[in-house]
Amino acid sequence: MKILLEKLQKLERMEEIATHAEADYEREPENAEYAATFDLAYQNEFKAYIEADKYIEYMTDGNIDFMAAKKMIQTKRAELISILSV
């Protein structure tokens, strides 16, 4: 369970980084460095999301499939983190 908590926390960090990078890019869309930074941040966010999703599927031995895990992360993440933090 600790691994899942770490993956969800990593996802939250990657989302924060991507949000800041997106704000910089939107403020100065002609800035190539901001564009590249946002692209990389978004890729890292997506990778963290997929890792958490696949880990839920793995740890439940497929009883929670990829799509159900995706929905859990999108709609019940706070509850998951709360339960796993105990």
For the regions a language model picked out, list residue spans one by one.
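Positively charged, low-complexity intrinsically disordered regions
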Residues: K10, M14, E28, N44, ...
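A structural signal for well-ordered alpha-helices, especially hydrophobic packing surfaces
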Residues: E15, T19-E22, Y49, D53, ...
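Amphipathic alpha-helical binding modules
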Residues: G62-V86
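N-terminal functional modules and adjacent low-complexity/disordered segments of proteins
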Residues: I3-E6, A35, D61, T75-E79
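Acidic, low-complexity, intrinsically disordered interaction modules
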Residues: H20-K71
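Short, charge/polar-rich alpha-helical segments
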Residues: M1-E15
